[in-house]
A protein has these predicted regions:
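N-terminal pre-Walker A segment at the start of P-loop NTPase domains
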Residues: 2-35
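Switch- and interface-adjacent substructures of P-loop NTPase systems
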Residues: 27-28, 35, 61-345
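Hydrophobic anchor at the beta1->P-loop junction of P-loop NTPases
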Residues: 41-43
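P-loop (Walker A) phosphate-binding loop of NTP-binding proteins
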Residues: 46
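Conserved glycine(s) of the Walker
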Residues: 49-50
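Post-Walker A alpha-helix
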Residues: 54-55
Length: 347
């Protein structure tokens, strides 16, 4: 009994320490934001849209800001930048700035490798103050610009949060009516339309159709389409253990109440559960833990490629942009709500 009590006390002590460290870390972030000492920028876009090139260029401009001619960067214009350092961000791989520079400066120049996972870099700017507060706060100050890079394919899934499997299937059914998607689906379209949602779930059959659906998603991307869900299925070797599911494209023929009351072993119920599991275990944690600290969001779109793909591709992009623009990414704190423009924070 004493050993059990001792074990519980140790666990309680550990939990208290972890909670305290987490609280202090969060408090530090709030203080930094309140005094304009830190800003976090999220950068995303489909693979090939230029994220790595954009971030490499942005870091390079900030590192050599005294020579870059950044009109809005007053401290740089007045030659008050003392040093710029690149730091790692806790919990993220370091963005490979040097690889980007090497690729762009090679002979002949090459594009940097596309983003396949999360990465981040903190650009720490040390500068001389130009303020009446110099006597109180000191002549120099530090401002951190954190840049987070992540695949745009991850962003595609965020609108799924709060959307039921049934409504997602209805959306996918409407998309399948587009000529380009109908062509890409081929025989798979008839298979997904013909499935009886009340039939008993057959794992082997579902896995075969799942592989065909993944190939269809990749073909959509190759054709320049933008609204592709689930987006994680586009990334090779990414989340191989994620739930196996796909949309049923004939659900408009069935009564909604009957579908809701379907047997737990039916195709519809199992698919619904796996869809929700995908959202709960993959999409929601990404939204909660990644976006909570982001102050600005940059989304890069290869508009020229989309436009050259035709009217369907253009309308597809408009729908996608509309979905991500209206999605609530995170709950903003008060310290996060009254942000100054980026370079206004460096005075």
């Amino acid at each position: 009994m004493l050993d059990n009590l001792t074990s519980k006390l140790k666990k309680l002590t550990t939990d208290v320490k972890e909670s305290t460290h987490s609280l202090l870390d969060d408090a530090g972030k709030v203080v930094d934001r309140a005094f304009d000492k830190h800003i976090c920028i999220g950068v995303t876009g489909f693979s090939g849209s230029g994220k790595s090139t954009f971030i490499t260029s942005l870091i390079h401009q900030l590192r050599y800001s005294n020579e870059a001619g950044l009109a809005s960067f007053l401290a740089a214009r007045e030659q008050r930048i003392l040093e710029v350092n690149l730091l790692s961000s806790q919990g993220f791989d370091l963005f490979d700035y040097q690889e980007g520079i090497s690729a762009l400066s090679a002979k002949p120049p090459q594009w940097p490798q596309p983003t396949q996972s999360l990465s981040s870099v903190i650009v720490q700017i040390v500068y001389k103050r130009n303020s009446v507060l110099n006597r109180v706060l000191g002549e120099t100050s530090t401002f951190n610009i954190e840049i987070r890079d992540y695949p745009g394919e991850w962003l595609l899934d965020l609108p799924l949060i709060g959307q039921s499997y049934l409504n997602w299937c209805f959306d996918q059914t409407d998309l399948a009516k587009q000529a380009v998607r109908k062509h890409l689906l081929g025989d798979l379209l008839q298979h997904l339309q013909a499935i009886n949602p009340f039939d008993v779930f057959d794992e082997s059959q579902i896995k075969q159709l799942h592989q065909q659906f993944k190939r269809y998603l990749r073909q959509c991307k190759e054709e320049g389409l933008t609204l592709i869900q689930p987006g994680r299925m586009l990334l090779e070797d990414e989340h191989n253990e994620s739930p196996v599911f796909f949309p049923l494209l004939g659900l408009h023929h069935y009564d909604k109440t009957a579908l809701a009351d379907a047997n737990d072993k039916s195709i519809y119920k199992v698919m619904s559960q796996r869809y929700q599991s995908y959202i709960d275990t993959i999409v929601t944690p990404f939204n909660k833990h990644f976006f909570d600290d982001i102050d600005r969001q940059v989304v890069l779109v290869d508009a020229l490629k989309v436009i050259s793909g035709g009217q369907d591709n253009f309308e597809d992009m408009k729908t996608w942009v509309g979905k991500i623009a209206t999605f609530t990414y995170f709950e903003r704190t008060k310290a996060n709500s009254y942000r100054h423009p980026l370079f206004k924070a460096i005075r």
